[in-house]
Swiss-Prot record:
Protein source organism: Lactobacillus helveticus (strain DPC 4571)
Subunit-level organization: Homodimer.
Name of encoding gene: serC
Cofactor: pyridoxal 5'-phosphate
Protein name per UniProt: Phosphoserine aminotransferase
Any one GO BP annotation for this protein: L-serine biosynthetic process
Reactions mediated catalytically: O-phospho-L-serine + 2-oxoglutarate = 3-phosphooxypyruvate + L-glutamate; 4-(phosphooxy)-L-threonine + 2-oxoglutarate = (R)-3-hydroxy-2-oxo-4-phosphooxybutanoate + L-glutamate
Described purpose of this protein according to its UniProt entry: Catalyzes the reversible conversion of 3-phosphohydroxypyruvate to phosphoserine and of 3-hydroxy-2-oxo-4-phosphonooxybutanoate to phosphohydroxythreonine.
Binding site for L-glutamate: 41
Length: 373
């Protein structure tokens, strides 16, 4: 039985990458040493990290005035790092509240003494559509505007970025990093954990414009952008294996036609599932169609008990980790870059058959009930 992993992260990795890791694990490049034990100060790792940076630059067309950095601590770590490094002039930021992770980013900035102005929120609409800019803003008021480009839990995404005037735009791209195309130059800073689209858990990519990298007092060294630029992301021991594995995924991504190629596939995958859900009489997705995510698709029936049955039976069929986030319930299918089209087709086939069987069972019960009247 083929197993497909629909987890929100850590997520599925490309089969060729897993195979290469297996082959190289005992002895990396014939060195007699595993990637798990090589020194981060070795020439071998210098090549690994520099190649990964160059491949990110190539894939995302990163301009020369941006730095590519590797951190630990996930996107959550950057919720603290970004305001510490960037909110230094006004100590005030703007935020569009599109869901759980945007809220977490705002809370962390506020915890650090930064004033957070939530310009718009769709919380009252259960985050089933995106918030938008209610008015123009200025860099004379704000250090930056924070957005979450893809909302992993709620299933929405900014396919077109909000207008932000001369205010620096900070994007949390954690769950659609390299899953669809964005212009890096539209942002002052991009960050994202790689464990959804680009690699295993353990490394966070930060892409930051050079003019935003400044000396800041009273900031932990482990979150200091200036220090990480100077040390080529090796102020301390970096996550060697995670960077190595991410590098392999980047090579694989180039072979898929780059981000444009993988975005086309992601659109095809998501359309396959959305088309089924829109025609279904049992399952439904309540997200505004123009705001739907390519990578995270929540859906449910009208009965939480039935949702649990779907999840359990899907698991038995090899369709793993479809349980929705605890804050919204239901089911969620995460269709990250390495999820093959065949996996989505298998899910749709399963849901179709489940719905058909459910209808038959329901009609049978009604028939028996009517005979007893």
């Amino acid at each position: 039985m083929t197993v497909y992993n629909f987890a929100a992260g850590p997520a599925t990795l490309p089969d060729p990458v897993i195979k290469q890791i297996q082959e190289e694990l005992p002895s990396l490049q014939g060195s007699g040493m595993s990637i798990l034990e090589i020194s981060h100060r070795s020439q071998m790792f210098d090549k690994i990290i520099d190649t990964a940076k160059q491949d990110i630059k190539d894939l995302m067309h990163v301009p020369d005035n941006y730095h590519i950095l590797f951190f630990q601590g996930g996107g959550t770590g950057q919720f603290a790092a970004v305001p510490m490094n960037l909110a230094t002039k006004h100590k005030r930021i703007a935020l569009l509240d599109s869901g759980h992770w945007a809220t977490r980013a705002g809370d962390e900035a506020a915890n650090l003494g930064v004033t957070v102005d939530v310009l718009d929120s769709t919380k009252d609409k259960h985050y089933q559509e995106l918030p938008h800019m209610p008015h123009a803003i200025s860099a004379s008021d704000y250090d930056y505007l924070h957005i979450t480009t893809n909302n992993t839990i709620e299933g929405t995404a900014y396919h077109t970025l909000p207008e932000h005037g001369d205010v620096t735009l900070v994007g949390d791209l954690s769950s659609n990093f390299m899953a669809e195309e964005y212009q890096v130059s539209d942002f002052g800073l991009i960050f994202g954990g790689v464990q959804k689209n680009l690699g295993p858990a353990g490394v966070t990519v930060v892409i930051v414009r050079d003019d935003l990298v400044n000396h800041v007092d009273h900031i932990p060294s482990i979150l200091n952008y200036e220090l990480f630029v100077k040390k080529n992301s090796m102020f301390n021991t970096p996550p060697v294996f995670a960077i190595y594995a991410t590098g392999l995924v980047l090579k694989w991504l180039k072979q898929q036609g780059g981000i444009a190629g993988i975005e086309a596939l992601n659109k095809k995958k998501s359309a396959l599932l959305y088309d089924f859900l829109d025609q279904s009489t049992l399952f439904h997705n309540d997200i505004k169609k123009t705001d739907r995510s390519l990578t995270n698709i929540p859906f449910k029936t009208t009965d939480p008990v039935l949702d649990k049955q779907v999840i359990a039976e899907a698991d038995q069929a090899g369709l793993k980790n479809l349980k929705g986030h605890r804050s919204v319930g239901g089911l969620r299918a995460s269709l990250y870059n390495a999820m093959p089209l065949a996996g989505v087709q298998a899910l749709v086939d399963f849901l179709y058959n489940f719905e058909k069987q459910h209808k038959n069972n329901t009609m049978g019960k009604r028939y028996v009930s009517s005979k007893n009247i």
